[in-house]
From Swiss-Prot:
Annotated DNA binding sites: R294, R313, R318
Location(s), subcellular: Cytoplasm
Free-text comment about domains: Has 3 domains, the large (RuvB-L) and small ATPase (RuvB-S) domains and the C-terminal head (RuvB-H) domain. The head domain binds DNA, while the ATPase domains jointly bind ATP, ADP or are empty depending on the state of the subunit in the translocation cycle. During a single DNA translocation step the structure of each domain remains the same, but their relative positions change.
Residues engaged in binding Mg(2+): T69
UniProt enzyme class: hydrolase
UniProt keyword list: ATP-binding, Cytoplasm, DNA damage, DNA recombination, DNA repair, DNA-binding, Hydrolase, Nucleotide-binding
Family: Belongs to the RuvB family.
Protein name: Holliday junction branch migration complex subunit RuvB
Region (Head domain (RuvB-H)): 258-336
Length: 336
């Protein structure tokens, strides 16, 4: 199973990029959720503008789909500068990074997505660029090779990652601002869904937006994807506004339940409950029971279920919690 194939995957899908970009907030006063991040960034940006400085380098981390790229764009807009965008895997050679850095204007933003995937060679070039706004370049080869230093304009590097722990300490320490994005609450997601509906020209009732929001796994990207699928359903199966009833029918048809679980989530939980009496069960046995690789369970299925309190990891294996039993209308006693 590929994570991107799931409707409730938080990973970006290229075909959605254009629509997602159109629905993104452009400024901090349009940014919903993450109140602590918003408050801090407002102060940091105002202070940098007041001094006439580039904003300190910024690291944004957190689960996928929470708006790291959106926040980077907002920072550039608020600072009134351009933003160049790239990603860690794309920067294969030091020259790739040098080409980007030497084309920056003063105070511009360089945004590197998946910054934890930078190669060591590229990362070494980044250190003096971040710290001293200087670029060390090797000219020539062999004994005739020499290093020259190029001065760079003051700029802001914004790095985004889902795996902050994978960053090397020297790189992490060079970020003056570090922000973690958290999962969104239902109220904030409902507002985001309502705003996206306006962008799409949809007649969405508060009950309809609530139904989409509560099944979106705390993630704006998933909320917007579900909204588009509900729109498809309403255009074919109903007329008029997207009400709570219409949204419920659409999401039930798509097999996304009230917790935001899909078929694979439920299959995993029911395997633990039905086949292994609620656990504990070892990962290899569980993988065999549902016909998936153990890596798929560990990296794709488990994290959200654990975070929501439906599965517990123990030294003896995985166990279903009371939340899992209640979700299916069961109790431990039902299993004998």
């Amino acid at each position: 199973m590929i994570e991107a194939d799931r409707l409730i995957s938080a990973d970006a899908i290229p075909e959605e990029e254009f629509l997602d970009r159109a629905m993104r907030p452009k400024l901090l006063n349009e940014y919903v959720g993450q109140p602590q991040v918003r408050e801090q960034m407002e102060i940091f940006i105002q202070a940098a503008r007041k001094r006439g400085d580039a904003l300190d380098h910024l690291l944004i981390f957190g689960p996928p789909g929470l708006g790291k790229t959106t926040l980077a764009n907002i920072v550039a807009n608020e600072m009134g500068v351009n933003m160049r965008t790239t990603s860690g895997p794309v920067l294969e050679k030091a020259g790739d990074l040098a080409a980007l850095l030497t084309n920056l204007e003063p105070h511009d933003v360089l945004f590197i997505d998946e910054i934890h995937r930078l190669s060591p060679v590229v990362e070494e070039v980044l250190y003096p660029a971040m710290e001293d706004y200087q670029l060390d370049i090797m000219i020539g080869e062999g004994p005739a090779a020499r290093s020259i230093k190029l001065d760079l304009p003051p700029f802001t590097l914004i790095g985004a990652t889902t795996r902050a722990g994978s960053l090397t300490s020297p790189l992490r320490d060079r970020f003056g601002i570090v922000q973690r994005l958290e999962f969104y609450n239902v109220a904030d997601l409902q507002y985001i869904v309502g705003r996206s509906a306006q962008c799409l020209g949809l007649d969405l009732t508060p009950e309809g937006s609530l139904e989409v929001a509560r099944r979106a796994r705390g993630t704006p990207r998933i909320a917007n994807r579900l909204l588009r699928r509900v729109r498809d359903f309403s255009e074919v199966k109903s007329e008029g506004a997207i009400t709570g009833v219409v949204a419920t029918q659409a999401l039930d048809m798509l097999a996304v339940d009230t917790e935001g679980f899909d078929y694979m989530d439920r299959k995993l939980l029911l395997a633990i409950i039905d086949k292994f009496m609620g656990g504990p069960v070892g990962l290899d046995n569980l993988a065999a029971a549902i016909g998936e690789e153990r890596e798929t369970i560990e990296d794709v299925l488990e994290p959200f279920l654990i975070q929501q309190g439906f599965i517990q990891r123990t030294p003896r294996g995985r166990m279903a919690t009371q939340h899992a039993y209640r979700h299916f209308g069961l109790t431990r006693e039902d299993l004998g």
